Amino acid sequence: MFWIAKTLIAFLILLKTDCYKIAIPANLIDEVNPVLEFVDFRVQVIPYETKPLWRIKQESFKIVGISIENGLFSVCNCLILGASAIILPEQYDGHLAAAAIVQSIADNTNVPCVSLHLSPPTRPSTHLHPHLNAKSLAVAAFIKREKWKDVVVVFEEPDELLEITDMITAGHFDPDSFSSQLVRLKHGDDYGNELKHIKNKLDRYRIVINIPLQKALHFLEQAANMSMCGVLYHYVVMDMDLVTVDIDSIRGIEDCNITSFGVHDVNSEYIEDIRQEIVHKSSIRLPKKGVPYTTSIWIDTLRLLIRSMKSIQIWDEPRCGSSWKSGSDIKKRFFENPLAGISGDLHWAPSGERSNYTLHVYRRTLSFQKFAEWSSRTRRIASSEAVVIANSSEKLTLEGKHLKISVYLEAPFVMITSNGSYEGYCIDLLHKIANILKFTYTIQKVRDNAYGSKESNGKWSGMVGELQRGDADLAVASLTISYGRSEVIDFTVPYMHLGISILFKKPRIRDSDWFKFMDPLSTQVWIMTFASYFVVSVAIWIIAKISPYEQFERDEDNGQYKPVDNQFSLRNSFWFTVCSLMQQGSELCPRAASTRLLTGIWWFFALILISSYTANLAAVLTTRRMETPIENADDLAAQTKIKYGTLGRGSTMSFFNESKIETYERMWQLMSSSPGLFVQSSKEGIARVKSSDYAYLMESSMLEYAVERDCELMQIGGLIDQKGYGIGLPKGSPYRELISTAILRLQEKTELTELKEKWWKDKSVVCEQPKRKDQDDGESIGGIFIILVVGLVLTAVLVIFELITTRKPSPAQSQVIRHVNVIPSFKLGFFRWNVN
């Protein structure tokens, strides 16, 4: 145990005349041997003309231990054996002193020393890793490219926190517009508490994971079990080997949206060719895609060292205490001999570090696909044309996916049957879309029974909130597309167009009205007509009194004027105008031009009035009209008797709240001042309309459904606004275009129209409509008979009054009285004639 704790295991490439010898740590012999087998194969294919092919033989491998107490002797002993290069191991934590000894001796003797460790020891050594903060810079560039405003960064060890600090520093993020939250994981494999904290407390959906690969996979698997996958959540995994993992084999992670990085393009033909060589010529175990990061660094390091040594003539051997001349040549060739390595093109900076390297950026929705590259030279992420073309060849599909569907119960869109299953317009629509795109789904009712509105704490309720939190993949309901919602979720194209309208109860058809013949003219017109009749009658009487042509008549024989009786007495004037109004003739005829002018104007007035009355009377008597106290939203806003309101949440309420139109502003002021005007459901609003003087402002689609099934309800006016229903998806969902295309396809085939006909039209309900009447039953004009009877009675009373008030009969009256005695003779003659 003491030896393990105090010993650094170094890999020594030993130079002999017939082979290279390499010392390998005992605990890594099984891992490294396959790599050396592959390098042996790669060296064999390098042609040389001046000397025979040098080979690496597995049986020549040797283990060399360098202790801290005896470090100088151990290294010098290795050099005596002919070591031509030293490779420091991948891990030497706790042995920094021994590593420093090896590095110092290598520098003094000029023996090439290459480190497999990501970070160099106290003295810089040559290594093939990208810079220590390369991943941090790449992640920072990705966050800025995506314009994220907040992230959660997950880590476990202090050195991982150091990389995160580098990331935040390198990003130069504006503290006013960007925030990050650090979450340190406890040791172990259970991350449930940390995930609950992220989901419920932090309420953030962009998570950077900087932990080892296996731990990262456990973290993602547990996140998937807590419904923290899907297009809403986005994970950035900093481990370089994630892209080589068959992630679809891990339950639940296949739905996670993940971005990761790698040193090579796992989908390139070059990497695939190398993979095939490794598989066929060695026992290295490789994943299904790409080459693991550590393996690629191993292979590139050995290949570059061997190529550098084989490119020169080595005449001397290294010795402790002296500088090895051939070592300088090997180092020079090492940096001057570029290599297209598995870990990328190898270029070097003067400091001995890699430069001009590229990290490939992968995004996973269906599978890991390269979509961009990060360059160490520009420190930016850019999508090359080749990457764009490659990505365009990947066909996005929902086939085989299983989606969680959030629904809101609202007839006829979504309803529950007696056996607990769902039905309705939206359910049929979802089924048709699923058949087109070949996905399966599970339906879940929205927990808080709301469409979704922004709360005072900035969070969204209802289906919108579930999409934001990742609790649902789709929201399929009568979900209105609005500006506020579209800022936090995505919508498909509208599957139905609609607007806000007014639901009101039908007025009762007025019972039999014997004075209906007065309806063609309003009360005001009747009053004005009688007033005109009185004024014109008096005017004719006055003008006739004044005009000389109504007092005298020209004698045609001698041309002299002789006085005559004025025919337009006050009584005759009223009689004359009423005869004209009733379009009847009279024995009176005006003589003067003034009276004739007034008479002509009165006749014109009577003509228009009677014509209008006749036309309106025909319509009134043939159709039973239902009179409503309001005709549109303006009428509703202008009165106070009929109360009105909307659903207490949702887009209709938001429309009136945000409207700048004066009428709707007044309506909102009234509604907001009386919270009792709002209802909790459309069912409650409809019941309130039927039971009281209440108008319910609702979306026309549900209004049509209610009117179709209840003959007591009706729509008032047209649409107040124009909008549409769409299917909701999480923001940035790649499936929006697929589902929108499916909706357009159904629309083109008129299947959406058929669905509406199916769910809106109720053939069992037939509402009686006002009908035209071919015959009048007398109910509408019975009043004229009443007027006739009253007129006869008044006439009889009047004639009796005239007889009583006249003391001495005039000659004419006496003649009439005498004629009364002949009535019996008239009756007798009538009966005789009838008998004959």
Curated annotation (Swiss-Prot):
Intrachain S-S bonds: C76-C320
Sequence ranges on the Cytoplasmic membrane side: 545-600, 802-836
Gene: glr-3
Disrupted gene: phenotype observed: Abolishes signal transduction during cold signaling in intestine and ASER neuron.
Gene Ontology molecular functions: glutamate receptor activity; transmitter-gated monoatomic ion channel activity involved in regulation of postsynaptic membrane potential
Gene Ontology BP terms: detection of cold stimulus involved in thermoception; detection of temperature stimulus involved in sensory perception of pain; modulation of chemical synaptic transmission; synaptic transmission, glutamatergic
Native organism: Caenorhabditis elegans
Keywords: Cell membrane, Disulfide bond, Glycoprotein, Ion channel, Ion transport, Ligand-gated ion channel, Membrane, Postsynaptic cell membrane, Receptor, Sensory transduction, Signal, Synapse, Transmembrane, Transmembrane helix, Transport
Name of this chain's protein: Glutamate receptor ionotropic, kainate glr-3
